[in-house]
Amino acid sequence: MNITRRVAMKTGLGTALSALSASALHGEDGPLFGIEGLEDFWLATDAYIYGYPLVTVEMTRRIITNAPRVEGTHGPMGQIISLRQYPNASWRDVTAPNADTLYSVAFFYVDKEPWVLSIPDMKGRYFLFPMLDGWTSVFAVPGTRTTGTGAQTYAVTGPGWSGTLPPGIKEYKSPTNIVWLIGRVYCTGTPEDYAAVHALQDQFKIVPLSFYGKEYTPPPSTVNPSIDMKTPTREQVNRMDAVAYFKLLAQLMKDNPPSAADAPEVARFAKIGLVPGQDFDPSKLDADFVKRIPQVAFDRIMLQIRVNPAVKHINGWIYDTKTGIYGTDYLNRAVITAVGLGANRPQDAIYPFSQKDADGHDYDGANKYVMHFPKNQLPPVSGFWSVTMYDPNYFFVANPINRYVISPRQNLKTNPDGSTDLYIQNQSPGTDKESNWLPAPTGKFILMLRMYWPNENDPSIIDGTWTIPPVKKVA
């Protein structure tokens, strides 16, 4: 389950792909166009888009860490939260869960001192431990692809830290004072494999540098009853009016300053009262804009799924190969925050999703579909791949064989010509084909292809030399 990147896909992407909404551009008080200060309005939407990742990460942090102890998907600051099993179809804690990797996540601050992450010998098992800054950029990725599977220890240092680390510890410098670890460990989901992964998870440790090599007991943590623990993160962010949003953004930028590359963009925002290191000045923001700025800005963000060149639309699949490191592409960074919070670098994982078949029609469990891979054309990865079935709200679908994902773990059967067919339908395709069956609901559904450690060269989804096949409706 991903408690990070798909916190708010619950609203559905199809309805969010429209152009700027009429309600936002006109509103209850008349049309927006033609009023004085329109230039400032669009500048404010730029600022909203720019800050969307930082505000969303903060709201996510508040929810995940608002717990007295590690339990389920929550745990205090500075403690690793390890999920111990895959969810079933009744799970409703977060959207778009997965059944390929078990997560180990943590939030901590590096403003006062570095934190040390210890990873045991993973015994050849695939894993990765991306480290994200407050702006959702992945600044380091220890893991199988980059550092191997042996025991390893890292110190995550803050932007202003300088000092000497103990021998054998590699430094990763975070650009911000807030750090988000999102560890993933491959697991087949069998009782034996669960036990093996649990033994590894129990050895993941993070401690302040001053306690490295010593016994460490995390400080007590209390629950803040004012934090909304039920409303999805994205919805909470989107509910803020512009003043509340910019006040929070200004406060966050004091501890997580923009990068040097952002300076020209950020300098523009002073005109509307947003200056790094200072409190937000709401007097510089037209009161008529306060409610409309978030509406229009979010529509601009979601429009990127259609118009941003980083977002690919191929054979009914939609995916982005410019994730994890965004530079100054603030719109792409914002849309990934909205629909894929915590996304990996493309070299580590790509997550194409599909709501429509090869003919452009919405998937419907009343029909039968086949995803056909020609011989030697299965997803080219060094890690693993899978296809997951979701209902329209991005939850698993109950089915008689309790299968929510299909991958080579099912010992897929090949056709006589060496090709492979995945059968996507509500009823069994027959016992001889059940190994290749991904059960669908009776109604609408969504598919997601996960590709971990995808090839970077031919054949590769990253450079376009490998193409995802369409999902075709069959008689």
Stretches found by the model and what they are:
Residues M1-T15:
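N-terminal secretory signal peptides and thylakoid transit peptides that target proteins
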Residues E28-A475:
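A compositional/structural signature for long, glycine/proline-rich flexible linkers
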Residues L17-S23:
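Hydrophobic h-region of N-terminal signal peptides that target proteins for export
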